[in-house]
Amino acid sequence: MPMIPPALRRTQAAATPTTSSPAASSSTTATLDSQSLCALPRIRVSASTLNSIVTPVKKITSETDVEAWKASAAYSIYTLFLQRVCEACVGKPTRLPTRSTDAPVTPVDKLVSLLWELDSWTQEIEPHEKPQRFGNLAFRDWGARLEERIDSLLSDLLPSRLHAFAVELRVYLLDSFGSFTRIDYGSGHELAFFAWLCFLYRLGFFDASEEQEQDETLADIQVEERIGLDIFPLYLMVVWKLQDRYGLEPAGSHGVWGLDDFQFLPYVIGAAQLRRQSGLRPNQVIGASSHASILQTQLATRTDPASLISTTLVLPASSLVGTQVEVPLPNLYLSSLLRIHVLKRGPFHEHSPLLNDIASSVPNWLKVYFGMLKMYAAECLAKKVVVQHFAFGGVGWVWTHQAHSELPRLATPSAPVAARRHLPLGGIQGNMTSMGVPTPRITRPPATPDSFDHPLRLPPRSTPSRPSTTPSVPPLAASTRPAPKPE
């Protein structure tokens, strides 16, 4: 079983900023550049690894299993991968790749070609004309084609040295586009696709050569950037079209009190894209996305998913502080808001109160980003209704019943900073609580600005003590650069 090596937990270079972390600042101009994180553990292709391949099956059936999942190496690897992709996207615009008629050359090109092939099926498979109450049954025809052709798709995608891993990889790809039985889609399917990408990454699929590096390289960062800014937006376009074409139901949606009916990760990655600038602030993004110059002029005839993701918009001057040059456009956060405006009618604060509260209450994108990470961990990765469908195999995502004692945990407020640097998504025991999202089933206080405080915020000391000289740090694995000062 692949284990987390010491490199995952070791500080690569201790950054010692002289000022307090911008994450703890209430300034509207607080920003943070991209940070270096420790490398993901790779999967070595060896005889023992090949012998460990098994068909993934579901393992999470109880809340006890959810706790075991949160304490597992698989959880830590997934959350680190998500953070690495986010860091690679900081300050950069979305780039939706176009469909090429040329033969794909690089691994990324092959993956892009696969997604465009899947998108073409959506146009080919017509919805059933007979009125249907819960989604269109033609989506099952789409799913049947995927199940029929997935082995050939993976055979064309993977190099020969990785063909044996198709047994495990196919399960995650099949689960990435929705439930063909229930005709629905939700954040669990989004999780499956991102887990599939992480599996490919760890196998060395994206590597230029078969030599797999253990340390972070420029090539790794470039691959993560393409995953976040090219591949994931293209996947988002594919599933948005599926939702529209076949009327997919939201899977496990909180309704009006949820962040989004279908997606979550676009808000996490989108907040990372906006984290380095303060020209477009959270309290202005709702107004910008609903401005008449955008919805009625720039996007008047282009409200399809591809246009919402790829169009470089000219933001209204009233929504900006300073110039527009520093705002990365397009970005996934704004694209997701535009998608909501296209699909829903009425005042934004009524049909999307949580997004509205975040925009009006959180002072800067740095806090939005860390809050989204914390909320994703609490509302998706820690919810049985979401992760119960996640499958575990023998190589890529491995199930264990016991917690990994080697994973660092923050036990007391006096724990050293170095012990807190590698906790994915602020993974402190007892700190992965809900963001305060009320639902019909569970009554909780409404979300407040404090909900988006730093995920590693410590409780107040019960007795007076000498002020610490160690600054707080964001919940990133390891930083080689100090966090910049607020503007």
UniProtKB/Swiss-Prot annotation:
It holds the Pfam family PTPA. Residues 1-28, 426-487 are annotated as: Disordered. It is found in: Cytoplasm; Nucleus. GO terms for biological process: mitotic spindle organization. Its EC number is 5.2.1.8. Transmembrane segments: none annotated. It comes from the Eukaryota. GO terms for cellular component: cytoplasm; nucleus; protein phosphatase type 2A complex. One of its GO terms (molecular function) is protein tyrosine phosphatase activator activity. Keywords: Cytoplasm, Isomerase, Nucleus, Rotamase. InterPro entries: Phstyr_phstse_ac, PTPA_C_lid, PTPA_sf. Its main location: cytoplasm. It catalyses: [protein]-peptidylproline (omega=180) = [protein]-peptidylproline (omega=0). Belongs to the PTPA-type PPIase family. PPIases accelerate the folding of proteins. It catalyzes the cis-trans isomerization of proline imidic peptide bonds in oligopeptides. Acts as a regulatory subunit for PP2A-like phosphatases modulating their activity or substrate specificity, probably by inducing a conformational change in the catalytic subunit, a direct target of the PPIase. Can reactivate inactive phosphatase PP2A-phosphatase methylesterase complexes (PP2Ai) in presence of ATP and Mg(2+) by dissociating the inactive form from the complex. This is Serine/threonine-protein phosphatase 2A activator 1. It comes from Mycosarcoma maydis.
